[in-house]
Regions:
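NAD(P)-dependent Rossmann-like dehydrogenase/reductase catalytic/cofactor-binding core
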Residues: 2-15, 41, 190-197, 209, ...
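Glycine-rich Rossmann-fold phosphate-binding loop(s) that bind the pyrophosphate
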Residues: 25-26
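N-terminal Rossmann-fold NAD(P) dinucleotide-binding loop
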Residues: 29-30
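Aromatic pocket-lining residues of Rossmann-like dinucleotide-binding sites
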Residues: 36
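A short helix-to-beta-strand connector/capping loop
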Residues: 73-86, 148-149, 190, 383, ...
Length: 526
């Protein structure tokens, strides 16, 4: 398996005083220029509009001044950094640069034209980098005389604040070039990761299920956007729910990225765009920038409250059913014990392959395994079945999602409600859809992350760093898999695939391999 996983030797970053050029003075270009100047480089900023580059440098100077006011930068350092920035009157002014970073429009032919011109200007030792977020690095460099010196250097916006840099190698990129850019980004205070040039690189590929599963849950009427967002924040630990985030990004942008990844992977159902989101785009409901998306953003608009179940009495008792020890189940058991319920450790023994459960006033309560509660109840021949969703940290989560089987009695369901409420959870009931909310999203993120590793796009460590530093996930998807257990994730995805009958939910071969290698101790991280 060929992959760009880590430096092949001790990498050498660019010297602090070396000359760096940034082409394009928009938000990304000016941010890159600011970071490079702050790291000690002489920086030349070029834009086809000279005044735009000059204004960008003035704006960077204002940023430095504000950092001084806040005590985050000394006046001496700010003056020195600003003094290292200058405008290029012509592209020829970048001739002596050791690194040129392109941050212009996302258009393949425009980028190819720029790099072809740069090759006639810079030295043979100059590294050429593209900040593209979506275009193949291989394709950009295909017509260069020396494509081996072209590498992706994908920053995230806002550049000064976001820690991640994806260092993307095309088929022709020499490893030492990628290594140098990796080391340079690290010296600039970033968290770089190596990636192979494939559609979406790491983040824009692996993040697709975060949006896709939320949109599907909404289309299946599992819950409203405010409730789904609250579950993802307050149980899943994500900073923003998927609908809030899509409104912030803009549905035109988010839908376009999903569609481009879907097309680039030749219609792989994993990346199928949402008809619901396309309708949002068709309607012009693009999110915050148009004043309406899944939420309304007018001056008088109030964000709707998430659904929460009415308070129920505390049940008299709860017991654990027979089943294998399970870290997720045991974490919840500890919280219930902390709320004063007498619940013993989950027994194993002869029923080591049984799913652990709680018993409460006749109801059986399980963690979702990818089947609906109704499917589970039918298999158990026990109508009073209730499922609970995954949480990042059951000790600290403030909300939990529950789903009841269609035949579950009100009495049994209310007892389970009272149990979780007595433990301090706000409970949101969702419709009985397979896989629920957090578990479904996390499992699909983990599945895509495992496929990226299996296909040599990146390492397991890189994908977890990328998702935490690039999109602020509370935990890397493969680290989350380790905490849940590979066996549980594989079972969950297999059940989800069976419930829907779709290739979208097929299990990554790497997850199956991990499971087969050692069903108990299979892990992605030591």
């Amino acid at each position: 398996m060929t992959a760009y996983l880590a430096p092949s030797s001790t990498p050498t970053e660019l010297e602090a005083g070396s000359l760096v050029a940034v082409i394009g003075s928009g938000a990304m270009g000016s941010g890159i220029a600011q970071v490079a100047a702050s790291a000690g480089h002489q920086v030349i900023l070029f834009d086809t509009r000279f005044d735009a580059a000059a204004k960008a440098i003035a704006a960077i100077g204002n940023v430095f001044a504000r950092l001084v006011e806040k005590g985050r930068m000394t006046a001496l350092d700010a003056d020195a950094a600003k003094g290292r920035l200058r405008v290029a009157a012509a592209l020829a002014d970048v001739r002596d640069c050791a690194l040129v970073v392109e941050a212009i429009v996302e258009d393949l032919e425009v980028k190819r034209s720029l790099f072809a011109e740069l090759e006639t200007v810079v030295s043979d030792t100059c590294i050429l980098a593209t900040n593209t977020s979506s275009i193949s690095v291989t394709a950009i460099g295909a017509e260069l005389r020396r494509p081996q010196r072209l590498v992706g250097m994908h920053f995230f916006n806002p550049v000064p604040l976001m820690a991640l840099v994806e260092v993307v190698s095309g088929l022709a990129t020499e490893q030492h070039v990628a290594d140098t850019v990796f080391a340079t980004a690290a010296r600039w205070g970033k968290n770089p990761v190596h990636a192979k040039s494939t559609p979406g690189f790491i983040v824009n590929r692996v993040a697709r299920p975060f949006y896709a599963e939320a949109l599907r849950l909404l289309s299946e009427q599992a819950a409203d956007p405010a409730t789904l967002d609250a579950i993802m924040r307050e149980a899943g630990g994500f900073r923003m729910g998927p609908f809030e985030l899509m409104d912030l990004i803009g549905h035109d942008v988010n839908f376009s990225v999903t569609r481009s990844v879907h097309q680039a992977y030749f219609g792989d159902p994993r990346f199928t765009p949402s008809v619901l989101q396309q309708e949002m785009v068709n309607a012009g409901f693009l999110g915050r920038k148009t004043g309406r998306g899944f939420y309304r953003y007018g001056d008088d608009d109030v964000k709707p409250a998430p659904q929460a179940e009415a308070a129920q009495p505390r049940p008299d008792a709860v017991s654990t059913g027979p089943g294998a020890a399970d870290p997720v189940f045991d974490a919840l058991r500890q919280r219930l014990a902390g709320a004063g319920f007498s619940v013993g450790a989950t027994p194993g023994g002869a029923l080591e392959h049984a799913a652990p459960s709680f018993h409460c006033n006749g109801a059986q309560v399980f963690l979702t395994d990818g089947r609906s509660a109704t499917e589970r109840a039918n298999a158990l021949d026990h109508a009073d079945t209730v499922l609970f969703d995954l949480a990042l940290d059951y000790a600290g989560a403030t909300r939990i999602a529950l789903a009841r089987a269609d035949g579950c009695s009100d009495e049994a369901y209310k007892a389970v409600l009272g149990l979780f409420q007595a433990a301090g959870f706000t409970v949101s009931r969702i419709d009985d859809v397979p896989g629920m909310v957090v578990m479904r999203t996390v499992a699909m993120l983990a599945n895509e992350a495992a496929d990226a590793v299996n296909q040599g796009v990146c390492s397991a460590a890189a994908v977890d760093i990328a998702m935490q530093k690039g999109v602020n996930y509370p935990r890397g998807p493969l680290a989350w898999t380790d905490s849940i257990g590979v066996a549980q994730v594989v079972t969950f995805l297999s059940n989800l695939a069976s419930s829907y009958g779709e290739d979208r939910y097929r299990v990554s071969p790497l997850l199956r391999r991990k499971l087969a290698s050692n069903s108990v101790k299979a892990r992605f991280h030591a």
